[in-house]
Amino acid sequence: VDAMKQYAPGMGKVPVLSEFGVYNHNTQFVRGIGHAVYIANEMIDYIGFGTPYINKHCLVDYPYGADNLGSGSQCVIQAIKQNDGTTDFVSTPSAKMFSIFNNMTGTTQIGQKIEGNVTCYTYKGYNVPLVKAISSKDEQGNIYLTVVNNSRDERTDVNLIIDGKDLTGKDL
């Protein structure tokens, strides 16, 4: 965001992200789930930067014009041609991820601290943490916490402590 401000100083421009990266794998199922987890990680980062997310690389994949990773790998909606020539549409894991962020977050981001968060893996010199999270609250004071476990193979236990609240939402 700061780097963008130098190109349009004082103009009130807000950078908008128009594409999310692609997670490649041999099987479409793992690739679809992996891509959704990747999107969750990126969205947490972008929200932290104060940058809106509005678009996706490929909204709909049609069987006759699928992206180069194959049907359903990169799109939000997969089109499926039926035997009678009509087309049906189904949500992908990426669509579910957008739904979680659009419907299960509050309007105000609140602070959080993750202790003991180890590196899950390293990609091109960038350390990917085992857990990534974002916390927010709405106008009624409801608290939302979205946690992403970046390990495909390991279960990750998370202990939550919310200042001044128990997990039923009652004040302490």
Give short role names for the model-derived ranges.
Residues V1-A3, V90-I100, V131-V147:
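Extended, compositionally biased low-complexity polar/Lys-Gly-rich tracts
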Residues G10-V14, F49-I54, Q140-N142:
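Loop/turn elements at helix/coil->beta-strand transitions in domains of secreted/extracellular proteins
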Residues K124-G169:
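Carbohydrate-binding surface patches
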